[in-house]
């Protein structure tokens, strides 16, 4: 590097403006530039850095030396070249590894721009070597002129040239020649290419190899990847100081070479005609490495005949990577001549962050033979490589990608200067930069630039082989692991062959993407490019681009079935998608008009494809309601129009709920799937469609449709109304239709179903009549035709015409339809296809008995559903027959639980009969109290069946058939959870006692497994829980019953009947019988309305669940649920409303959960006021208001998903506990008042006496053990407490804490109980307080007080106390009552009576 630095000093001294042209010197003198120039509005001035100065100059000089030696012959062909070079302040970039290129570059503000560049150093020498150059006026002032004068003159010429060009060419061309910092309007013809014009400068042939190599090194250092900017920046209108060397754009450096092939136009101020389009190419110094590598592996240049292909032909050609061969030349570029029919093509790359400019001058065609020779030379040295095709398949949308690009690659070859770790400019220009040439494109000359030294002399390669299926921004985000292997050898001459497995590294492209400067430039480019879209040749872009891109993708990745539309959704940068879609018809959109079929079998709708990955926790609180619910009518179509089609509904629909969509599908004969099954035909998608369902639907090939498309699918099958202009089977001119009078015999209308050539009619009996033509001129219908008269065509005499075909869709002759309605009385399925089993076909028809009893299962095979449960139940019964010892784990009873009407009782009876048991059934209507059950069941095991006494003798053997047959009995207790009231009190406890010692099976049936009445019974029974049978299991049996009874129903009607009965088979059969006896005709349309008119009994828990889930639109339905049990349903709502997850849609979206709960609680508080008024004042007229405030309003706020199962109201338990404790306090108060020690009220008893008594009843036992027993008994006697009062005091004072008796030893507890029960205590008995006799005179109240034997002798012998006791008769209770000697009552010493012994001292 030191040696290179020494070599660099010479070119600086040779040129007077070298201090301004070189990068380092330009950075040092940045303050000398005029302030306030417009270029500073775009770029910020950064600090100078001269670290890489020597290396750059050395490389430039060496490169120019080599290029002059090899391409001396091509120096004569150089044209005027303007170079805009973007330099970056980096050092030793040539030594960086590919991994270093991937690392983000340091974000720097834009450097100040100098008008001169490193190439000005050798401008005089280039003029000498270029005798044919006549465009000296186009060059800026060279070395001798001062910097300010040179800038002014250059800006003046550029400004004039731009003004002149605007009048003769498109707006993009004028901006191309202008001296603005960003030539943006030149982009508009190619919306995928960003044009940046930093320095407009005359490009001449370098003097020495030193300057050429220095420039090469300088350009290599400035190579970087750009991401498309976002923010707009103000476009300068003032004089712009155009520095000669570099301007940085978010650390991404490029050189843009403008090649003007019109060498004859020597006047710089002369406007450029439209045919003379400048060619602007991005030039980077390291392209010398890149192009040599490409030279060996790129495609063979096309022959002149191939370059004549038009845009339409490119759709059939495979996209081939165009080789780059112009880097071999060091002379000014002689661009490809293009006919004036083709406008200037500028590619604006929005999807890709590459900023590139391409413009082609289409006038010059000279020296084409020499260029073709150069191409043939390249052809020999660079054979076609198939991997180049895949390399060209980038997802960057380039308008023209065909073989004609090969003929233009020479003019764009200087653009191949980007590092291969990113998307190089040469990648863009080689493949897509030039549109197909319609004529005159056969003479192509490789472009030769002084900034690209010869590869043969300096074979440095930096271009790597990029093998990518298709370049797109989406793949950048999706596949960051696709990397590009870049081989960089700064000073080696070895050529590295490209690897076919190398991938394009998309990660590097977006380095420095967030720079505010980049975003500002990008927005400015987008804004200005939109204004020039009208100048784009749309036909030569969209067709070519989309076709070739698809072919490239299919070739590179045949298994990639993902469309670009889907990959865009997965991207992280929405900026590129918005920009690419903002061009409308003029933009090249990868998703627009695909001409190559993809491997997806499903045609997805743009509305159905989600734009973002749905959040899995989005509907954690419930799915929202449709935003436009109720805005669309239900579809009407032909019967069974969806038969044979399977649908899957996903997402939130616009108008219908998910259940409503399922109902519509089933109504018209379709099937609903819950997941993406193989037979799936359609996925009806809404907002936030499920990701797994969407992927599964695509895999199975299902078509993705929206809600509107689904409704249209049904509506379009509806028969069209009668048209008076229909043509018939007789070809007639189309005259004015004349209506005919309606005959009186017409009794019903008809509906047009299809457009056929005959008129199909039905007679009054419903039999289809023959097809008859309608005669014209008869003034009416034929006599044999039933139905309304239809307008017929008036024809010439005798000519007949037929009206549109008519078909009656209603089977009953009395039913009529109009042309806009559909008759649906005919079932979707043929009743002939229903198979009636033998067990049903043998039953006589009619309504003599209930169908439930008539069609009750006769064998176990007739039971629908739960086969495994019944099999296990049969095995349990088998153990009672076996002689082997019973399993100890087997219990003596079984508990069959499940919803009503699913066959619990029928299964129990059938299985008992099958296993040889005689069932004794106790139904809920029977008395099942403790005494009644004991009376009925205690001696069942000893009973004998009456049939045993009537044995029959076998004629063959002469023995009694029943003699050796043992009769077994099973007890069936149906609806065990229905025990209630005093009549059944104690029945469950008695049953449990019988089960423990029973020698026969007990079969208990219940509906509510979680009922508190069954809680104790569950511990002694084997649980067998039955489930509701599915619709498929039940529908076949219900259809068989309906067919046997002569009904015409459809599977849809059966489903509605079954679901309306809450999966109750018994109720469904009753409903079918009701429909059969009714005179009303039922069909798919009116069956739902008819079923809603029927009342069904539901439990309070089911009613509360439906209220919490039901939509607020039907208040009457919610009130019906409330009145099912108006005392319990509000309590269930109050218990579970806090646990319900609101849906969050509709009106709920305006509030958060806390606000919704608060408003629901306020409504419940108001309802309590109405409930109190109803209970105390008997104001039953407030009951509907109570239902609204307690159920409807709270459920409207928190409607959603309630917890299942619903919790039982805890209020009832708490109320019961509070009542019990109040009773404890009342009893304690009464017992304490019976003594003369206290007279307190309830509050004082609870607050003061209970804590004190607790301490004195427990602490002596804890501290003194057995010695404290006497003290505890004395306290209890002083206050008249019983043993139950002691336990109640502990319960009242514990409040959920630990039992204080746990600290008392077990031996002390037992001793206390024995001693307390062994002694006599005064007890309180309210019944003894009443006096005997009506008068009550002479009755001693104290006589009624009971005394317990065994009282202490001390109390008996106290005479003084005895007299005091007599005086205090009003006392309710006395501890001891001692009779004096004068008492006449007999003394008893042994009997337990109300008197005690009296002793005298």
Curated annotation (Swiss-Prot):
SUPFAM superfamilies according to UniProt: BRCT domain, P-loop containing nucleoside triphosphate hydrolases, post-AAA+ oligomerization domain-like
Amino-acid positions noted as binding ATP in the UniProt annotation, renumbered to this chain: 898-905
Identification of the protein by name: Probable replication factor C subunit 1
Species classification: Eukaryota, Amoebozoa, Evosea, Eumycetozoa, Dictyostelia
Pfam family, one: AAA
Entry keyword annotation includes Transcription: yes
Gene3D superfamilies attached to this UniProt entry: 1.10.8.60, 1.20.272.10, BRCT domain, P-loop containing nucleotide triphosphate hydrolases
Keyword Zinc attributed: no
Localization annotation: Nucleus
Region (Disordered): 1-639, 721-829, 1334-1401
Known function: The elongation of primed DNA templates by DNA polymerase delta and epsilon requires the action of the accessory proteins proliferating cell nuclear antigen (PCNA) and activator 1. Subunit 1 binds to the primer-template junction.
Assembly: Heteropentamer of various rfc subunits that forms a complex (RFC) with PCNA in the presence of ATP.
Family: Belongs to the activator 1 large subunit family.
Biased composition (Polar residues): 577-588
GO MF entries: ATP binding; ATP hydrolysis activity; DNA binding; DNA clamp loader activity
Biased composition annotated in UniProt, kind: Acidic residues: 174-186, 559-573, 1344-1365
Main location: nucleus
Species of provenance: Dictyostelium discoideum (Social amoeba)
PANTHER family per the UniProt record, alphabetical: CHROMOSOME TRANSMISSION FIDELITY FACTOR 18 (PTHR23389), REPLICATION FACTOR C SUBUNIT 1 (PTHR23389:SF6)
Occurrences of domain BRCT (ranges): 637-727
Biased composition (Basic and acidic residues): 1-11, 55-111, 118-130, 227-241, 361-382, 465-484, 499-509, 548-558
Bias-annotated ranges (Low complexity): 242-252, 310-339, 400-422, 438-461, 485-497, 589-616, 743-765, 799-829, 1391-1401
SMART domains referenced in this protein's UniProt entry, alphabetically: AAA, BRCT
